[in-house]
Structures are given as structure tokens and as C-alpha cells.
Amino acid sequence: MAVNLVLSFALAILISSSPTAVGVDATEELKEAVLTLDAGNFSEVVAKHPFIVVKFYAPWCGHCKQLAPEYEKAASILRKNELPVVLAKVDAYNERNKELKDKYGVYSYPTIKIMKNGGSDVRGYGGPREADGIVEYLKRQVGPASLKLESAEEAAHSVVDKGVILVGVFPEFAGMEYENFMVVAEKMRADYDFFHTSDASILPRGDQSVKGPIVRLFKPFDELFVDSEDFGKDALEKFIEVSGFPMVVTYDADPTNHKFLERYYSTPSSKAMLFVSFGDDRIESFKSQIHEAARKFSGNNISFLIGDVADADRVFQYFGLRESDVPLLFVIASTGKYLNPTMDPDQIIPWLKQYIVEYGNLTPYVKSEPIPKVNDQPVKVVVADNIDDIVFNSGKNVLLEFYAPWCGHCRKFALILEEIAVSLQDDQDIVIAKMDGTVNDIPTDFTVEGYPTIYFYSSSGNLLSYDGARTAEEIISFINENRGPKAGAAAAVDEKTQIDAVEEEVTSSSEPVKDEL
């Protein structure tokens, strides 16, 4: 069966089982450096602050736990400096706050949003995750959208090796070009730093004799700088988004790459991911070949990434990859997922060419737990590699639960599922089964947006989702109402129908026998 293709690496948080949080009284909100918000006080608090930063987190999230002390420290520094910036947090895993989670598009943890003008202007946070970096980033967000550069020293300090930087060069700070530059700077300031100058000679790269107006984009990758003279607002935004994105994204521990990774995994293009040890003697050859592949296949709607296996634990766990297969090239596309393990640098381009031209001849990769050697419990264990045998091709009526080990509702339902399985274990035409959706690819026949998700596949081939009460009585009733004929019964009926039809045809076509004596 085809599998769901996950093009966003940010894992969706599915069903909350946390206890309800206690609301924060508005008079008590200023006693802590980081304000605690929930559905009860969120709108009131956000509305009265011109600049508030909100962290959406989950109590169990490791990255949230790492960020928490840095976020608290940053809040304390900002308060002591009397900057008009407030830091707050929301437990987005709490069911009470689900509406806030959905409203602000929280699909991974932590997610940080900058809310200005009482919440009317909401933007993503694109800055560092340590206290000093958070403070400096937010200071820039409070100040002017673009800063004026007046010396080579200022330019060197602001531009060199500072990520993606935009500098507008203008003969005078007026006119349509300058105004549009400032509008775009205000709109995109959360993700990029903007500067302007009237003297291109102070800039560290590019033609220093230009008078402008031009926009020069500096970046620490690819061609290092790019110029544009198109000051239409839409054109300027597109120039920044395209030129400011690496030809090959790097997956490593560098926090400046986080925003590139988020965009990489959220775009609908196919993904080609090369994972290798950055300590490998051949690393420069691998980098050269993946960049050459990105140039060669730029028109094939493929986004490219190179990752250090030392920092890729989450990726490997999520996609079910093995470190023993490194160096590996992994492709995710609408047609499936494809893996080329233990490869050499000079195999990258030929294999990608084969994928593009002959992908139908490549065996798709499916993430699956091992098939259980023993599967004799009342609740059968289904994995990606045996779902066809147990569910689709068994000829039986199968109730299948998709669950996650961390899901509290799933743990409660496990007892009920066991009760159902024991009650029906003498019925040879019914199978009660479960599948861990976090470590197995789920066929596209199923829509799993939360855990637990329950489906029923009848012996006659009907697939139904179960949305009723999670009680043994209700589910058993649902199974009996929707079950198909017993295994072999349909075939027997078919065979008898065919025999009857043949007999009828023979009888009707035989000429009457005349008795002559």
C-alpha cells in the first residue's frame, strides 16, 4: 500500500492528555518574568501589550525544557533594561488551549510568535534560542526596521558572517525605491536584518562604485552576495526569499540553520537528503557532489540537504533510518520514499538521475518495525511490513487501532481494546489489532490526525473509521453491524450461484424429448 509522505519535519502534536491549567489572574501576571497564559487570560493580556512574545510549549518536550531557563533569563534581562518587550508562555499541549494552538498554527514545539499592537500583527520568531541572543534579536525587532550604515567598520561588524543580511544603497533616503525597501524591511524583519547606506564603498563585497538604488543581499553560502535593482514590493520579497535560501540546506547543530530547515521541510517539493559524518575524509567530495546535483537538477522540483549524522538523531528516528547505512541518500517524493545506503560521493548524481528518469523501477522505502516472530496475543501487532497480510488480504473483519506510546488516551484505551479482543477471540473471522503510528509508515488508505485513531476493515473490503464511544460494548456492536461474511462464505455463495446459473442454462437450452412408442 502507498504510504503517507511527511514533508514537514516538525512533528504535529496530536491529542492532549495534560491536566487543565489554572488561569492566571491579571493582577498577578507581573510577579514572574515570563507570563503564564491560557485560554482564560490570553486575549486580555496580549491586547494590553504593544510587543509580546509568546512561547507555545509542551511539558514533555525536550527542546522546550532546554529553552525554558534561557527564555526566563531573557525575560529578566529585558525587564531590567526596561524595554517594552514582554515574554509569555502557553502550554499548547493542554486541551483547554487547543483553540489557541490551532489559531496560531502550532505544529511543533516550541513555537514562538511575536505579537505586536495588541495582537493585531503576528509574526514568527526567527532568532536564537539562548538568552543573550534572544535579547539582542528582540532589541532589533523593537527598533527601526532598517539601520543606517555610515562606516566600513559598522558594515563589517553588521554584515560579515552574520547570516542573510540586506543592505539598500540609495543616493538619497527618499523616493519609491527607498520607501518600498522600508516597507519590506518592516514586513520581513523577523527573519532578516536590514540596513541602508548612501555609500557602497563601505560594503565588504560587491561593486563599491554603485550609487544605487540597489539592494545587496549578503549570505554566508553559495555566491556570498547578490544584487537586485527591482524595487517592486512583491519582486523584492521574492528576491529575498529565493536568493536568501541555500541551494543545499545544512542539517547540523548551528542554530542559524533552523529557519532554513523549517522552510525546507515545509515546502511541497521532493526532498533529497544526504546524511554523512562531517568527520568523514570524503566530506568535501560529498559536499561538492550534492551541490553539483542541486545545480544539475534545479528544474526538477527537488530541494537538497546535507546533514551531519552526529546531529541527526531526530531525523533518523522519525524516518526510521539506521546509522549503519551512512553515508546515505534519502529521497521523499509524491511517489514514495527511496533510500540509497552506504554510498560513495560519485554515486550521488547517477542515482538521482535514475530516480528522476526511472523512479518506477526503484523499490520504495517503507519505515517499519520488525514483523513480530510471535503474534499470539488477543490484540495482534501490526507493522508496516505485515499490514497487507493481517488487514487487507486476510479476508477477515479487522478492527485496527493506530496509537502512540506517549499518548495518555491510548494507554487508557489499551485496556478496552484488550477486553474487546478477549471477548471476540473465539470468532475466527474477527481480528483486533494495533499499530504504533510513530514508528511505522501509515498507508494512505487511513487518515490519522490524532491518537488513538480506530478503523474497521470488513471481510468484504469496506473501510470505515470509528468515531463512536470508546467502550467495549459500543465497539463490539459496531463490529457486528459492519462485519462482512465469514471467510470463505462469499466464495461459496459465488460458487453456488455460478453452479445454479449453469444448471439453469443447461435446462433452458435442452430440447424437449419426444416419447415415441
Curated annotation (Swiss-Prot):
Stretch forming the signal peptide: 1-23
Entries under SUPFAM superfamilies matching the protein: Thioredoxin-like
Q: Sorted alphabetically, which CDD domains does this protein's record hold?
A: PDI_a_family, PDI_a_PDI_a'_C, PDI_b'_family, PDI_b_family
Motif Prevents secretion from ER mapped to chain: 514-517
Q: Name one GO molecular function term.
A: protein disulfide isomerase activity
Q: Which domain of life is it from?
A: Eukaryota
Residues the record annotates as the site (Lowers pKa of C-terminal Cys of first active site) are: R129
Q: Which GO terms describe its biological process?
A: protein folding; response to endoplasmic reticulum stress
Q: Identify which residues the record assigns to the active site.
A: C61, C64, C407, C410
Q: Which reaction does it catalyse?
A: Catalyzes the rearrangement of -S-S- bonds in proteins
Instruction: From the UniProt record, list the coiled-coil ranges.
Output: none
User: What InterPro entries does the entry give?
Assistant: PDI_thioredoxin-like_dom, Prot_disulphide_isomerase, Thioredoxin-like_sf, Thioredoxin_CS, Thioredoxin_domain
Which cysteines does the record link by disulfide bonds?
A: C61-C64, C407-C410
Record's function text: Acts as a protein-folding catalyst that interacts with nascent polypeptides to catalyze the formation, isomerization, and reduction or oxidation of disulfide bonds. May play a role in storage protein biogenesis.
Family the entry assigns: Belongs to the protein disulfide isomerase family.
Give the protein name, as stated in the record: Protein disulfide isomerase-like 1-2
